[in-house]
Amino acid sequence: MNLEFFVDPNRCIGCQSCVAACSECDTHRGHSMIHLQYVDRPISVQTVPVVCMHCDSPTCAEVCPADAIKRTGDGVVQTARKPRCIACNNCVLACPFGVPKMEAEFSLMMKCDMCYDRTSAGLKPMCASVCPSGALYFGTREEIERQRPRSRPINTFQFGEQTITTKVNMMVPRDGGVAHVDVLSAMDDSAVGRADMLDSVFDDM
């Protein structure tokens, strides 16, 4: 049985349960490795959980001069290793998803490792085990496609000319017909939508 991690942004209700649970993970030293991002804060309360996407070719590891970031055989990109990490911030700047964070208390880059101590044993990550809306889901592809027939998982992201494939899946509308998430286009669409909404507000004043 191939267990996978899925993020369904449309289901996030901003409750912060995942953030609280993540900080309780034994390997996180009381720090949460997940955070909620406001999609368009000036006009919306919509949030999306931000976890490490565990890239097939992790940029964070590629730019690390100390070879402190390792990827497991099953595709999980791990937190930097303390004896090697020199706190240079290269990984923080290089990640296209903005995930790695430098923890000043430990002089160490720490990030979501998909609760590897749990998932490698077939258990759910802490965040997915407490998410009340199913925005974070750990299970088989067959299960989630059966439960959510209007959505489908994709794990390819386009950043301009760069294509990134990840271990973590993003749920998108099935009728959209997209083969990947065009990140820059989505950001442009968000900006256009915000401008149109603000124009309509001022027109009514």
Question: Model features per residue range: what roles?
Answer:
Residues 1-205:
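Non-ligating segments of multi-cofactor redox enzymes
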